[in-house]
Regions:
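Long, non-membrane, amphipathic alpha-helices that form coiled-coils
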Residues: 1-7, 11-14, 237-283
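Short, well-ordered surface patches within globular domains
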Residues: 2-139, 181, 190-203
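Generic ordered-secondary-structure signal
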Residues: 6, 51, 159-177, 236, ...
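Generic structural signal of hydrophobic/aromatic residues within well-ordered alpha-helices
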Residues: 7, 14-21, 118-122, 160-168, ...
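Generic low-polarity alpha-helical segments
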Residues: 77, 177, 199-200, 217, ...
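A well-ordered secondary-structure block
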Residues: 105-113, 117-225
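Extracellularly exposed regions in secreted/surface proteins, prominently low-complexity, repeat-rich
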Residues: 205-256
Length: 283
């Protein structure tokens, strides 16, 4: 506990300095628009690799376990995001309720996670889940989540990259709490394994504390967009229930370049086959 507090104190000292020093480098050439709640597999892979790079830069600075963003955790994160949308979960709504309860002197306050959505997916893999009591308060084991009141889901590639950058910056250096920073950096873990699997996804839900502003309809202020970063380490995987709906594929996700090369090779093979068949027919 003393070591944990020391780490939190150090993160606090660095927070204001590093937050100002870290800035996203805009790239106006990345102008293609995408719907973050309905991404193609290629774009999911693109953004996952960017998140993986940011995440591992943080881990490297702390000398902690490597993170692998792979297809299985992409599925996990996507399913959690769908759960948020299915439940109409408003993080700002939960925060408003927590403030109301705090004013009444309540100590055990709800937090923003849709723990039911997370537990429902974790259970399919036979992973441990939080108790019903903790679930009702938002308690869970696998998600770091960042929410913005800018409810736009149609963004340029540049804007999505910036949102992911801001997500990790917010996790690490928000200056208010360091539980997210500790989790992302794996700063207080005592486990002996050196791999964690992760995935990133997005969801859009109604903001129950706000309404659309007719003067700024493009901002979709009546909505909120969540960035979900889910992680499962090898220790958690080793403790799964024997009876489970899904297995967990630990295969690494290929790089975009490798995927493009594979697609090109397949296209060339198909073309060669078609050419050979055409020549045979002509003869």
């Amino acid at each position: 506990q003393v070591e944990k507090q020391r780490i939190f104190n150090r993160l606090g000292e660095l927070s204001s300095i590093l937050s100002k020093a870290m800035a996203y480098k805009e790239d106006s050439s990345l102008s293609r628009k995408v719907d973050v709640t309905n991404l193609s597999d290629a774009d999911k892979q693109r953004f996952a690799k960017y998140a993986e790079n940011l995440h591992n830069q943080i881990r490297s600075a702390f000398g902690t376990s490597k993170v692998i963003y792979n297809t299985e955790m992409q599925r996990f994160a996507d399913d959690v995001a769908k759960g948020y949308e299915a439940h109409g979960h408003s993080v700002f709504g939960v925060s408003a309720e927590a403030q109301r309860l705090a004013q009444q002197g309540v100590k055990d306050l709800p937090i923003g996670h849709d723990a039911k959505a997370i537990n429902d997916v974790a259970r399919k893999y036979g992973l441990a889940t939080s108790s019903p009591e903790r679930e009702a308060k938002g308690g869970q084991y696998y998600e770091n989540m960042y929410t913005t009141s800018n409810g736009q889901n149609l963004l340029t590639l540049n804007e999505v990259y910036r949102r992911i950058f801001d997500t990790f910056k917010g996790f690490m250096f928000n200056g208010q709490e360091y539980a997210h920073a500790s989790s992302i950096a794996d700063a207080t873990s005592t486990r002996t394994d050196d791999v964690e699997y992760a995935g990133i996804s997005f969801s859009q839900t109604k903001n129950t504390t706000s309404k659309d502003n007719p003067n700024f309809p493009q901002l979709k202020l009546g909505y909120e967009v969540h960035t979900h970063v889910l992680g499962v380490d090898t220790t958690a995987l080793s403790r799964r229930q024997a009876t489970r709906e899904r297995e967990f594929d630990t295969s690494e996700q290929p790089s975009i370049v490798e995927t493009l090369k594979a697609n090109l090779a397949q296209a060339e093979a198909t073309l060669n086959t078609a050419t050979t068949q055409a020549k045979a027919s002509a003869d």
